[in-house]
Structures are given as C-alpha cells and as structure tokens.
C-alpha cells in the first residue's frame, strides 16, 4: 500500500507549516547575519547600539522576531477556519515581502530605497491583517454556529 501523506497531513496543517518553516529559516539566517555583524562592527552582546550598519541589521532582526509571534499563529488559524490555500498565499506574501526587506537591510543592495520600504510595509501589513481578520471571522462564525448567538 503506497504512503498517502494527504490523509495523514491535511492541507490546513501542511501549508501553514511550510510558511512557518521558511519564516523560522529566514529568522535563523538573520540571527546569523546579526552575529556576523557583531564581529564585523565589534559590538559585544548584549549591546545593540554601535555602528549604524550594525543597528540596521539588528533592527531588521528585531522586527522579524516580533512579527513571528503573530504571523505563525495567524497563518495556522486562517488555514484552519478559512482556507489553507489562501493562508499559503497570504503567508507567502508576507514572507516574500520580509525577504525583500531583509535583503535591503542585510545585503546592502538598496540602502535607503523608500519605494521598496513602502511596498514591504504595505504587503506585510495587508497580508498580516488579512490573516488576522480572517482568523477572527472564522472563530466568530464558528462560535456563532455553535451557540447560535
């Protein structure tokens, strides 16, 4: 009998898990970049101030750290209550936006590009609030149907 992963791992688990895995991978790369920047700019832990380039990298790492605590559960809840494929699309949009922004911070390709910064801000916020709003709607609908409020 062939191994059927779809019956074991449904889409509402697999899709947000993929987003979470990639997001945590991005976060790990940023942590590595931050460690390298600490060595390069001679900023000893736990200090987070020093060279402006170091502060840029530390700032992006901090932004990602703060966002992961919200984006991962929102992606899972949206996938469960609304749509796994839409959670993949919205979570993927957030990830691509974050990767582009991270590249501009960490790789010095676009130091002060306001257009790229604005696109990142719009995409990341729209995708996050869509995930959060959809999750709240799904939970509300579930409660309404359960208790006929």
Curated annotation (Swiss-Prot):
InterPro entries: MAPEG, MAPEG-like_dom_sf, Membr-assoc_MAPEG. It catalyses: RX + glutathione = an S-substituted glutathione + a halide anion + H(+). GO terms for molecular function: glutathione peroxidase activity; glutathione transferase activity. SUPFAM superfamilies: MAPEG domain-like. Pfam families: MAPEG. May perform the conjugation of reduced glutathione to electrophiles. It comes from the Eukaryota. Disulfide bonds: none annotated. Belongs to the MAPEG family. It is a multi-pass membrane protein. It is an enzyme of class 2 (transferase). It is found in: Membrane. Keywords: Membrane, Transferase, Transmembrane, Transmembrane helix. GO terms for cellular component: endoplasmic reticulum; membrane; nuclear envelope. It comes from Dictyostelium discoideum (Social amoeba). This is Probable microsomal glutathione S-transferase. One of its GO terms (biological process) is leukotriene metabolic process. The chain crosses the membrane at residues 7-27, 123-143. Its EC number is 2.5.1.18.
């Amino acid at each position: 009998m062939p191994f059927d992963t779809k019956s074991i791992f449904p889409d509402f688990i697999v899709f947000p898990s993929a987003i979470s895995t990639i997001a945590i991978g991005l976060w790990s790369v940023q942590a590595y970049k931050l460690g390298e920047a600490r060595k390069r700019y001679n900023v000893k832990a736990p200090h987070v101030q020093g060279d402006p380039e170091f502060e840029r990298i530390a700032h992006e790492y901090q932004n990602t750290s703060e966002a992961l605590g919200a984006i991962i559960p929102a992606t899972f809840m949206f996938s469960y209550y609304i749509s796994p494929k839409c959670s993949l699309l919205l979570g993927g949009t957030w990830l691509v936006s974050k990767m582009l922004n991270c590249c501009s911070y960490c790789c010095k390709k676009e130091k002060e590009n306001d257009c790229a910064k604005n696109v990142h801000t719009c995409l990341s916020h729209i995708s996050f609030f869509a995930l959060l709003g959809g999750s709240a709607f799904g939970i509300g609908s579930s409660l309404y149907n359960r208790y006929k409020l």
